[in-house]
Amino acid sequence: MSAYPLYDVPYLVRDPNDFRMSAKRHQIEVRNQAVVDDYFVARNKGISAHEARKQVADKHQMTSGRVQVILIWFCKEAKKRKKYDFLEKFSLLEEH
């Protein structure tokens, strides 16, 4: 078990009622959020970043590179939306 508590990942998924977003886009964002949640859970268990990406990729039937792209996108989106708590929690995980 990690020394860090299981963090609440701030939800960056937009409102599904947003008229600018299709149902398909919303489905993708919800899936991406699940990927990030699973990654945080794995990292909090003390699993290495590489192994955590592999586990999450297997669970969601994608490549570990795709998981990494989703994580990068979430970091960029968090910075854009000024969700600094997410970036701080993410950087804490990546340091250990």
Summary of predicted features, one role per range:
Residues 77-96:
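Short Lys/Arg-enriched helix C-cap and helix-to-coil transition segments
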Residues 52-61:
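Short alpha-helical "recognition helix" segments of helix-turn-helix
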Residues 1-23:
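General nucleic-acid-binding
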Residues 39-46:
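Short helix-to-turn junction characteristic of helix-turn-helix DNA-binding domains
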Residues 16-38:
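Short, Lys/Arg-enriched anionic-surface-contact patches
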Residues 39, 71, 78:
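DNA major-groove recognition helix of helix-turn-helix
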